[in-house]
């Protein structure tokens, strides 16, 4: 059966049932749950240290009212980080390459930050649409520009995550295909492409981590504007 490069981005099905939900729940099963023991193992210690580091980075720009979002934002970045990294394994499906899933995460969370600002401080939230000192003739145009910029924020969040991961997966598949195809004909060139593939894989690991961090960091900055 002939497969295209984009078949890796289609959700697998078992008996007609999409397996995207189990693939989202699998990373949570791989994380060790803290026990009641006095001494934790090394993996639990590293996980706790990493969670505290992420929470500190995300909560630093927020005031005390925004700290109630700590559990949601920390859980979100851990989920995205786990899914992105597991998606780099061979023959695995990466749910975060689906724009529908990323938009399903970005749109409600962005809307929650916006509604929080409109409920708690409506004047300050609407004031972001018109910077202070704007000349009177530019007020209508600037309000339209700022409103458009506000409304495309969830789209930018979802498209950024989808595009970066999809491009990385396609590059890895293209270079790995070229490495296998060149191996019997030009072994030296195949070795060079294999080295490029190794470096690209390291880069994609960094991209997977950075994109998860950027997604949640931008949400925390949007929350900072509305608290």
Swiss-Prot record:
Claim: tRNA processing is one of the keywords in the record: no
Domain of life: Eukaryota
Disulphide linkage map: none
UniProt keyword rRNA processing, yes or no: no
Pfam families for the chain: ATP-synt_A
Family assignment from sequence similarity: Belongs to the ATPase A chain family.
Role of this protein: Subunit a, of the mitochondrial membrane ATP synthase complex (F(1)F(0) ATP synthase or Complex V) that produces ATP from ADP in the presence of a proton gradient across the membrane which is generated by electron transport complexes of the respiratory chain. ATP synthase complex consist of a soluble F(1) head domain - the catalytic core - and a membrane F(1) domain - the membrane proton channel. These two domains are linked by a central stalk rotating inside the F(1) region and a stationary peripheral stalk.
Name of this chain's protein: ATP synthase F(0) complex subunit a
